[in-house]
């Protein structure tokens, strides 16, 4: 999955893609964010980048037929994004356009168009306001929905999180305790045994299995917790 954006939507594109690895334990390559002007454009304006069709085309070289390219623009017209869409078409890659202008070129060129018509901005032309907020919500829905479909959650729990700091370790303990219906101390003890693998700890506690056997059972079910816990049931 590739998020590509013009200058004004740069922060949301990078932020959303960078949150996927710690939240869902996916590879950084699974959801990538690219912006007109590259990494320099995260903090500084790179003038002319969003008007460069060839730059968008070359930046999208990472795309293949197995990907989905999501292009984001309030106006729906940056040439940079037209380059991304052209590259996607050339490699038979599916495309989604997120825009706030139903008459823009993105609405014409993208395979699936999500258009949030938010009306005039409080400050005319400042698309970081209503347009940016609406597009950020849409982007969150897309990535979160995709992660749910691929088994990265159980009910409303982020059971694939990476417990890399104290806040996330505390969250992991609470998730394991609640799903496995055990005390926080039992949840912590099991998490310590399995290197903070939340799904492994849940399986070990709920199914009374050892750590390695729990990992094996998860692998048999493609790493999807709900398939294992509800084996034989409709999920």
Segments from the language model and where they lie:
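Glycine-rich phosphate-binding loops that contact phosphosugars or nucleotide phosphates
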Residues: 11-137, 146-150
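Short, flexible active-site loop motifs that bind/organize anionic cofactors or intermediates
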Residues: 3, 46, 71, 177, ...
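Conserved RecA-like P-loop NTPase ATPase core
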Residues: 7, 70, 214
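Short, amphipathic alpha-helical interaction segments embedded in low-complexity terminal/linker regions
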Residues: 65, 146-235
């Amino acid at each position: 999955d590739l998020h590509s954006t013009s200058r004004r939507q740069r922060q949301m594109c990078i932020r959303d893609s960078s949150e996927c690895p710690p939240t869902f334990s996916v590879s950084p390559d699974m959801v990538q964010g690219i912006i007109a002007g590259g990494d320099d454009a995260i903090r500084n304006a790179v003038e002319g980048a969003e008007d460069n069709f060839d730059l968008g085309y070359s930046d999208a070289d990472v795309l293949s037929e197995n990907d989905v390219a999501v292009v984001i623009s309030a106006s729906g017209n940056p040439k940079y994004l037209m380059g991304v869409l052209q590259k996607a078409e050339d490699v038979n890659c599916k495309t989604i356009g997120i825009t706030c202008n139903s008459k823009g070129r993105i609405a014409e060129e993208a395979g699936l168009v999500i258009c949030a018509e938010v009306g005039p901005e409080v400050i005319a032309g400042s698309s970081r306001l209503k347009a940016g907020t609406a597009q950020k919500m849409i982007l969150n829905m897309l990535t979160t929905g995709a992660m749910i479909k691929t088994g990265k959650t159980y009910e409303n729990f982020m059971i694939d999180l990476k417990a890399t700091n104290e806040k996330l370790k505390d969250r992991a303990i609470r998730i394991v305790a609640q799903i496995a219906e055990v005390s926080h101390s039992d949840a912590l003890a099991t998490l310590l045994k399995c290197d903070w693998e939340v799904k492994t700890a849940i399986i070990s506690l709920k199914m009374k299995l050892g750590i390695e056997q729990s990992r094996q059972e998860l692998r048999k079910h493609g790493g999807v917790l709900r398939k294992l816990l509800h084996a034989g049931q409709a999920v």
